Amino acid sequence: MVPFAGWEMPVQYQGVIPEHRAVRTDCGVFDVSHMGELEVEGPRAHELLQSLLANDLDKIEPGAAQYTLLTNERGGIIDDLIAYRLEHGRYLLIVNASNSDTVFQWLKERELPGSDVRDVSDDYALLAVQGPRSIERLGLDDAPPFTFATAELDGIECIVNRTGYTGERGVELMVPAEDAADLWDHVLERGAVPCGLGARDTLRLEVCFPLHGNDIGPDTDAISAGLGWVCALDKDFTGADELRRINDKGPARKLVAFVMEESGIPRQGMPIAGGGEVTSGTHSPMLDQGIGMGYVRAEQAEPGSELTIDVRGRDRRARIVKKPIYKQEG
């Protein structure tokens, strides 16, 4: 167990590699109840969120969700989150645990008359059931990604979200906190392998999902981070002017994915020759080599370009690759 954003979290159960492979080949379950949940409700809830979130909420109807960013005036990423449109005038935001209080305060300070922001994190638990057999093992009907619906699983009513942080088919099950332990047991009985933070990190890095605090943050703009696709630059939101400027001019640096060409495991903070830096790194269980992401000068950022990374005092060759680093065959 390790401390994480005020929680005690398991790094592993059986081991990072078997847990990782279970998710890639079958089904694993993560207790992600540390994530924050915020409800935004009222006749002006949509207006409030449209003025603050980078993506365009007009593109989703009730029953759908959207990956989006909360940005500051400089276009920096306060948090990356998922917005669920529960109904007209009512939203649920799933935010990173370490940013939950910050996001809540940011929204609360900007509340409009006719909008109400509430922190409901203590009311809910969240289990991520991920892997190619996850839907089958849970006995659920499949649904398109980034949609959600209410369903009953072994007598427990859940909100079933077709979302995840692994790059695999899967769902995130949201239940009242008092039902969490029973639901966890039911999911294990259905054959899911319990997984910890270690596998969660290696899985997300293989598919190049950014981690707030490593790859993105308040001092990292969305364009440089490769998240311009999340930003509706044709609407106004906090930071939009700066993001439009960076987008038009072109960023000075870019977040790239790479694989190691020599032995060595890259880690956050390791220097990349030419003024760059590793933001995330690990050993890929599926590729059996070191992989990572990091920022380099824009002119260095083409796939196929070679990098030199200082791995514990020794120069090691790496190669920039297209994202995702790992892609499931078929």
Predicted regions and their residues:
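Short beta-strand and beta-hairpin "edge-sheet" elements
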Residues: 78-81, 320
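Conserved, structured C-terminal
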Residues: 1-11, 17, 86-330
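Acidic, proline/glycine-enriched N-terminal capping motif
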Residues: 1-71, 76, 198
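Generic internal hydrophobic packing segments that stabilize the cores of diverse globular domains
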Residues: 46-50, 67, 80, 90, ...
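N-terminal glycine-rich flavin-associated loop
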Residues: 32-43, 84-92, 205
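Acidic active-site catalytic centers that drive phospho-/nucleotidyl reactions
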Residues: 31, 80, 172
